[in-house]
């Protein structure tokens, strides 16, 4: 089915191909991509959009000696297929299989591990400087999407790279602009001209000659910008010190290969603007690239058929609460850093468009923007993944907590996230949040508790965070009426003897199951900060062993808070802390991962009996 692709086991074989065969290879790769991802799930539309670009990069550059750094990295499936990992696609994002993102420990072709956005230019610049320092004639390429370019870190790197005049190629993979007007014969011709050696040599010679007459040099540069500006979108990147080339058609292999061949011989920082289409070559993904961005298994002939979930996800619980709360309070505004669908804000964005703010991939800005809104009387709710809130930690402390501003953080994907692996796991939020003064930290055990905690957080006039896991809850009915929970108060969910399980958030259900076998007391702690110190003291006074259970690293997490509470009151009861280990956990099925961490019923029982063998 894929006769040409079957012959490509590495980029050396690719570079030996006749250039005329590359379009056929692209067609076969697309067919294989759709067939493969339909069986495993994964990111589809972004990978379909970068087929030709990936082929051209490996065809022109001498990888892995030449470095390719992919921003975010979810668009690297073709890169993995062409670099000897095609067979591994059958276990994509599964335990023991290849990762959905570049990993240095997976292949020498993965020059830099990525998964969060906007890091590629900084990393590539570091590699370029290191190569220059070592006297190596190595090309270094960073491929970054238009969404990732909205983050400040990308512009910080551009600013640094332009000033250093290092040999570096930045490729903007722009899949958000129309391909019809800016990309055409004239534009492609200009791109080849500007990337050619004659143009580059003439440009540098002219700069040297005119450098003795600064005013004339400035006039010449303005004339050049004027000519470029007639057919290119901006001279912004020229102002950063880059030689801007493009935009060009990212699905025209002849143009891509010719342009890249020219660029690899140029000196100094180069910026190539490539326009692509998400989902290219698979009509269903082209028609709805958002639906096909991240997919579960599906029939490629029929396409994705949405199924109604029996149990609402925590993300859906948040989205419904947000709309309900917005109807009750005109001050509520919702903020997301480019995660509208993932954070459950689609309905809110339609029903309350004037109160909805998608700030782009800019977590730091999102948090400080929320702080500014709160300063002047609005009630901002920031919907953000746990792993991405890490990127705005200083803003969380400096701009929100120190000023004690009423910002609500709805923290999705807390705990393990399965197939996306360690880069997306929310393993640390309880640890990094509970040490910040002024903030309240809550962890719901079910859907209704999540709804009530969000309401509680919104009613407070101080910073508050509600962290909840990915996926569905236990199916508990949600109360339409919302009510404040007693601040810093947990509850006893099961009375037992000798052993007390202190469950935080998602760990309540496995604790209740384990308690049946152990005849243990179970407390639903609800609040990590302020901790229910009285409940902890009472449990310590009436039990021989306390067991804290959390879907967060045990290092500095909720269990540590319990130990601190006991120490402050002079209690010496034994405490067993169960949680995520001090390591980065590989991708896999979430239930399997929890089992391996000892956070299911069997694991909890086993750990307690090993510690308390009565």
Swiss-Prot record:
Gene: dxs
Pathway(s) of this molecule: Metabolic intermediate biosynthesis; 1-deoxy-D-xylulose 5-phosphate biosynthesis; 1-deoxy-D-xylulose 5-phosphate from D-glyceraldehyde 3-phosphate and pyruvate: step 1/1
Xref: Gene3D superfamilies: 3.40.50.920, 3.40.50.970
Protein name stated in the entry: 1-deoxy-D-xylulose-5-phosphate synthase
Task performed by this protein: Catalyzes the acyloin condensation reaction between C atoms 2 and 3 of pyruvate and glyceraldehyde 3-phosphate to yield 1-deoxy-D-xylulose-5-phosphate (DXP).
Subunit structure as annotated in this protein's UniProt entry: Homodimer.
GO CC field: cytosol
Note on cofactor: Binds 1 Mg(2+) ion per subunit. Binds 1 thiamine pyrophosphate per subunit.
Molecular function terms, GO-annotated: 1-deoxy-D-xylulose-5-phosphate synthase activity; magnesium ion binding; thiamine pyrophosphate binding
Cofactor(s) recorded in Swiss-Prot or TrEMBL: Mg(2+); thiamine diphosphate
Organism: Nitrosospira multiformis (strain ATCC 25196 / NCIMB 11849 / C 71)
Xref: InterPro entries: Dxylulose-5-P_synthase, THDP-binding, Transketo_C/PFOR_II, Transketolase-like_Pyr-bd, Transketolase_BS, Transketolase_C, Transketolase_CS
Disulfide cross-links: none
EC identifiers of the protein: 2.2.1.7
Keywords: Isoprene biosynthesis, Magnesium, Metal-binding, Thiamine biosynthesis, Thiamine pyrophosphate, Transferase
Protein residues bound to thiamine diphosphate: 74, 115-117, 147-148, 175, 282, 363
Family note: Belongs to the transketolase family. DXPS subfamily.
Pfam families documented for this protein: DXP_synthase_N, Transket_pyr, Transketolase_C
Reaction equations catalysed: D-glyceraldehyde 3-phosphate + pyruvate + H(+) = 1-deoxy-D-xylulose 5-phosphate + CO2
Record has Plastid as a keyword: no
């Amino acid at each position: 089915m894929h006769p040409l692709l079957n012959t490509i086991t590495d980029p050396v074989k690719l570079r030996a191909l006749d250039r005329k065969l590359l379009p056929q290879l692209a067609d076969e790769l697309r067919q294989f991509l759709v067939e493969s991802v339909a069986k495993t799930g994964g990111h589809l539309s972004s990978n379909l959009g970068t087929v030709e670009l990936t082929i051209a990069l490996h065809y022109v550059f001498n990888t892995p000696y030449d470095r390719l750094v992919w921003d975010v990295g979810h668009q690297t499936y073709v890169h993995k297929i062409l670099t000897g990992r095609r067979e591994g696609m059958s276990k994509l994002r599964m335990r023991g299989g290849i990762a959905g993102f570049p990993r240095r420990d997976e292949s020498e072709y993965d020059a830099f591990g990525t998964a969060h956005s906007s890091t590629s230019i900084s990393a590539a610049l570091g590699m370029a400087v290191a190569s220059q320092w070592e006297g190596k004639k190595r090309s270094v390429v960073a491929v970054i999407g238009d969404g990732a370019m909205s983050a400040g870190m990308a512009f910080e790197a551009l600013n640094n790279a332009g000033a250093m005049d290092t040999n570096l190629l930045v490729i903007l993979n722009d899949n958000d602009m129309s391909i019809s007007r800016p990309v055409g014969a004239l534009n492609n011709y200009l791109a080849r001209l500007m990337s050619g050696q004659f143009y580059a040599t003439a440009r540098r010679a002219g700069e040297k000659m005119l450098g003795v007459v600064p005013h004339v040099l400035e006039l010449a540069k303005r004339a050049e910008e004027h000519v470029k500006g007639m057919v290119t979108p901006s001279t912004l990147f020229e102002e950063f010190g880059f030689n801007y080339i493009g935009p060009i058609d990212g699905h025209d292999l002849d143009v891509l290969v010719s342009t890249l061949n020219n660029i690899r011989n140029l000196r100094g920082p180069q910026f190539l603007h490539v326009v692509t289409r998400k989902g290219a070559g698979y009509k269903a993904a082209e028609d709805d690239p958002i639906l096909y961005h991240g997919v579960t298994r599906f029939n490629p002939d029929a396409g994705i058929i949405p199924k109604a979930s029996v149990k609402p996800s925590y993300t859906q619980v948040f989205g419904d609460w947000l709309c309900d709360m917005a109807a009750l309070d005109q001050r509520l505004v919702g903020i997301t850093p480019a995660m509208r669908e993932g954070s459950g804000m689609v309905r809110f964005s339609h029903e309350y468009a004037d109160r909805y703010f998608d700030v782009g991939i800019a977590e730091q800005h999102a948090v400080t923007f929320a702080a500014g809104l709160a300063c002047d009387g609005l009630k901002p709710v920031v919907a953000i993944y746990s792993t991405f809130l890490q990127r705005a930690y200083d803003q969380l402390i400096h701009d929100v907590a120190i000023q004690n501003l009423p910002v609500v953080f709805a923290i999705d994907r807390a705990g393990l996230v399965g197939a996306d692996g360690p880069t997306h796991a929310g393993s640390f939020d309880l640890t990094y949040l509970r040490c910040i003064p002024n903030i309240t930290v809550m962890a719901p055990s079910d859907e209704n508790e999540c709804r009530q905690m969000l309401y509680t957080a919104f009613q407070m006039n101080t910073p508050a965070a509600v962290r909840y896991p990915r996926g569905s809850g236990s199916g508990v009915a949600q109360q339409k009426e919302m009510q404040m929970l007693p601040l810093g108060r947990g509850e006893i969910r099961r009375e037992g003897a000798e052993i007390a399980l202190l469950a935080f958030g998602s760990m309540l259900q496995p604790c209740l199951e384990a308690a049946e076998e152990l005849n243990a007391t179970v407390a639903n702690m609800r609040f990590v900060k302020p901790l229910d110190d009285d409940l902890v003291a009472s449990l310590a006074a009436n039990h021989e062993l306390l067991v804290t259970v959390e879907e967060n690293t045990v290092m500095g997490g909720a269990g540590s808070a319990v130990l601190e509470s006991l120490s402050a009151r002079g209690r010496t009861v034994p405490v067993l802390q169960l949680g995520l280990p001090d390591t980065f956990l590989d991708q896999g099925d979430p239930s399997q991962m929890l089992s391996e961490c000892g956070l299911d019923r069997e694991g909890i029982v086993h750990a307690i009996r090993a510690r308390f063998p009565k």
